[in-house]
Amino acid sequence: MGARHGVPWLTSYLGEKIMRTASLTVLALVAAFLFSVLPAQAAMDHGSGAAHYSDRAFLSGMIAHHEGAVDMAKVFLATPKKDQDPQVTAWADDVIKVQEKEIAEMKELLKPLGGIEESAYAPMKKAMQHMLEEGKNLGANMRFVELMLPHHAMALEMSVPALLGSNNPQILNLAENIIISQAKEMRQFKAWIAEHHKK
């Protein structure tokens, strides 16, 4: 079944460019994300917000967002090794490896655009600092996973306008990679949380 028949509302919402170029996997993930994570009205608001999209603002905000994830991972990895769940440790290691690499890539992409846009970077940096203060009543493993779940959801929400508004193939590829990898990890996080709440 083609993308138009599988998710018919996406043609008008995502636009012809994305329907022509994005993979079925990405379209399915975006559709599932918009329906399951964002409130219905918020999902529709992305359509009107696409006109105000800029690559510079997206990259600047995502750098701060990624830095927040790296900070959370480092806080977790600073806990005693004996208290770390091996799966959570692997996730934290992967967050640092992948997101530090993407931070470097985004900084390179920003160079011809004028560098970091503080009006996009600073609010996200502040939001990440607030998030880092949350969940202190939880154990280290549960805290990291519980924080990563909304953190990843925010990354998906930030990436949708990039798919809608960017004309830069590298940024489109970055946004697609974020959606695919972090949606997959969100499913894993939810399964881990459900399993460990049973114990």
Language-model features: locations:
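Bacterial N-terminal signal peptides that target proteins for export
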Residues: 17-27
